[in-house]
């Protein structure tokens, strides 16, 4: 447990110091999607976003640029470590560890590494892409409507 905590602290320090999170970049998304989002929402000040499968608050993030522009929102990801990063780097957002589904309950989660964008709840996809080399665990799942209703943003218009 102590080793896991030290590892998380070390990674968080590296993200802050090496990536200089607070120095703005032109784009954080993988292929500039955040720039397109910014163009389409440019006239909206203090907007609200919901990022399902958020994964990382900076690296390949479609919402980091919005956050830096004053928007706030909800970041949802299955991975506990992802949420630790969001809580550290985006404290003004609501960050929720959950799978989004068409029902409330539990769902199987298939993964090779604890922290990967390739982890999935789709067994067929996991078998095909992980060559049957993956682990499984049950995680909480919830409908997006029920999840949003539990936050301070209930009934708020989603801008992105």
Model-derived features with residue positions:
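Phosphate/nucleotide-binding beta-alpha loop and adjacent structural elements of enzyme active sites
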Residues: 1-160
